[in-house]
Amino acid sequence: MKLPTLKSCQLRGKRVFVRADLNVPLINGTIEQDFRLRSILPTINYIMEQGGKVILATHIGRPSAVGRAHLYDQALSTKNLCPWFTTQGFTIDYEADLVAAHHKSKQHFNHILLLENLRFYNSERESNVNFAEILSYLGDIYVNDSFALSHRNDTSITLLAQEFDDTHRCIGLLMEKEITELTKLRDNKTDDLVILIGGNKIKDKIPMIGHFMDPKRHPNLKAICLGGGIGLAFLKALGYEIGQSAIDAETLTLAQKILTLAGENKRPLILPLDHRVALHGSQDLMIVDVSHKIPEHGTCVDIGPRTLQAFTDELSKAKIIFNNGTMGIYEQSACRLGTCGILGAIAQAPGYSIVGGGNTTSAVYACSLQDKIDFLSTGGGAMLAFIGCHDPEKDLPAFAALAR
């Protein structure tokens, strides 16, 4: 990819509009996890070191006007982020009014100007040209450092980029790193790969799974290990009883198609051998082998020890390891043995590890392994889209807007 980069821009004396993804989990106004905030720091520091003024824009959550007259929600205000930036040594000016922000954008170049949650404006989600023009007045240079929104058509992601000429729009350092790291995986035809996919939302992951099913793209694929809800869908498609775990008809059909494709292309799918099962009316978990019938009143909440060992054994074969999705209901401590076990094995494996996805990243932190993964992506759906699409520069809206 040949997108313009931050280091190719002249920043001194310029107002730099940075579209970031600071969509961090907030509980009562307190940041629960600051991974995405820390990920943007190299870009912010570089701009300030080069003499530029940082105008920082983001969204948080999905504001809704249901039950209220407007989209504003104090719980989702970017004002909640100000104390964090202060603890990092920055002087931050928060401004909710865009007219006032325009005046402040020309002042105090050693301060960060933080705009209010862009999704408090209906126009942000509506691809609104007028809103893009208004935002463009706040900066001389546009920087997209929001990889996690690369697959979205939000105004600040696409139309705003078009308000700046080719020499005044670029990707930030985080975006550049994401592209570099994920390209190692996406376009790799030489290194031995092991892919671990969990979680649910099989429909969202079909293009990515299809990408790895192509033997011409990845002739050295050693295994695709499927756990979590996706693993259950494939077991169901093969006729196994999975208890109360619900798999809808569309998901089942998709799983059957992938199984057929895997057989035709001789792709090595590794499915769960056992699960930890919660029985209705009991707080205890039991381990059930898939060769046995999971009780009708039982729910699979995690992979079992045999599955963990089987997946771990595959990791030793890989030079590159990719994990997206959890192996169970990791939010509950009793149900995270599989997820933490897999992530721990990835951290200890000799291969280069790439892990991503919203829940997967949260699980990495829950298992205290954030410093032991080689690359932790900020992307979820964007990461899946980047890997699974034909040409990211044309197929992902953010990249297409910057490349034109």
Positions of PLM-derived features:
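Active-site loop-to-helix "anion-binding N-cap" substructures in soluble metabolic enzymes
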Residues: 1-404
